[in-house]
């Protein structure tokens, strides 16, 4: 029996969890600190740890996010692909460290299941039996969004996390994509509002004021 026992903190987290459980593709959108990435990561951990040996289930946590962010380009960063992308995925890694006991059997299972896949090099890949998380999706292009969503394979759930109010692109396709997919079988979109913010209590009033910038 796994020691991992995640509990949601509010009604919006309940909605997000139910959506991810019941649908193949889930968009989680909302302001900074509203637990989008936290919920996606907790769900991935839960699903991986539920799998029993010789049973069907999720085997991999696939993680990615756009690496053209705040002016930085992947090709000019040092190291191999994984080394280049890893810093961008630190929020997901931090959440895993918070939720799973260090040096535990569960942590070993999660670490073995983690796969970092640069968004720029997705072509030709298919993700089977995976919980696949695209973080900071407000910064993906239309072509990247289509490429990512079309990687879904058998037994896979895709979770797209993003805040359309914080984008490094002139035109974000995040909400437009969610609107186009609305009503499609297997798709869900949950918007996490300011009420779901789980970071410091100052974030909500601060972001309200900074929205005027």
Residue ranges and their predicted role:
Residues 2-134, 138-213:
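Conserved helicase motor core of SF1/SF2 NTP-dependent helicases
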